[in-house]
Amino acid sequence: MGVEKIIAAFENGKKAFIPYVMGGDGGLEKLKERIRFLDEAGASIVEIGIPFSDPVADGPTIQRAGKRALDSGVTLKGIFQALIEVRQEVQIPFVLMTYLNPVLAFGKERFIESCLEAGVDGIIVPDLPYEEQDIIAPLLRVANIALIPLVTVTSPIERIEKITSESQGFVYAVTVAGVTGVRQNFKDEIRSYLEKVKEHVHLPVVAGFGISTREQIEEMITICDGVVVGSKVIELLENEKREEICELIHAVKETEEA
């Protein structure tokens, strides 16, 4: 469990497909059912979003999913309980994507205890600057839960090295300057940026934000160790187009076999 479980998802040259689901969108039973589906479909890690009223890094699709969850009365406590229940059925690593405010409102120690009970292996906090990591990083290290760092296109290489020097799990490389969401084209500068990150960090590098098509996945996966697909997965789940999610997962698996 924990950091080692995330590392295992990348062992022996494995490429990771990491779908994002919003916790509580459609209800907590739906969250458990979606995690079971993604596990059976062959996803490597599942990223579970914690709904928040001011999601500054999220694009419109994820914002709407978070609002649906909050409007239905979903709580962080309820999400943890759902994860505790589904954890007994699946082995797929869990990574939570949460803003800092819900963690502090819940209580840091209580949050981490709940992560341990629910079998959470890592967390991503997009609005936690590197300079303020000590708010939660030492507690996570003791619990063997990875604090996944985010690096961006605009990050100088010295900062990327600094941010990732003591990190665990994988590096989340944000492939756009802006919020999440579906995008049509990735420029050559993104390829150059990802190659630069790969060269200077000691962890697997996962590309995320705006990846939505098989072609984008195939392009990213030749440079990176994995991809996060968020807005597109939420759209496909909402519209019950699960076979298309399976096709995206297969796009990653096929690159391993090539």
UniProtKB/Swiss-Prot annotation:
Entry annotated with the keyword Cytoplasm: no
Entry-linked CDD domains: Tryptophan_synthase_alpha (cd04724)
Record GO cellular component, one term: cytosol
Family, as annotated: Belongs to the TrpA family.
HAMAP family reported in the protein's UniProt record: Trp_synth_alpha
Physiological role: The alpha subunit is responsible for the aldol cleavage of indoleglycerol phosphate to indole and glyceraldehyde 3-phosphate.
Positions annotated as active site in the UniProt record: E47 (proton acceptor), D58 (proton acceptor)
A single GO molecular function term of this UniProt record: tryptophan synthase activity
Summary of subunit composition and partner proteins: Tetramer of two alpha and two beta chains.
Gene: trpA
Amino-acid biosynthesis recorded as keyword: yes
UniProt keyword terms in alphabetical order: Amino-acid biosynthesis, Aromatic amino acid biosynthesis, Lyase, Tryptophan biosynthesis
Protein name: Tryptophan synthase alpha chain
Catalytic reactions on record: (1S,2R)-1-C-(indol-3-yl)glycerol 3-phosphate + L-serine = D-glyceraldehyde 3-phosphate + L-tryptophan + H2O
Pfam families on file: Trp_syntA (PF00290)
Broad EC category: lyase
NCBIfam families: trpA (TIGR00262)
Organism ancestry: Bacteria, Bacillati, Bacillota, Bacilli, Bacillales
Signal sequence extent: none
EC number: 4.2.1.20
Domain of life, source organism: Bacteria
Pathway(s) the chain acts in: Amino-acid biosynthesis; L-tryptophan biosynthesis; L-tryptophan from chorismate: step 5/5
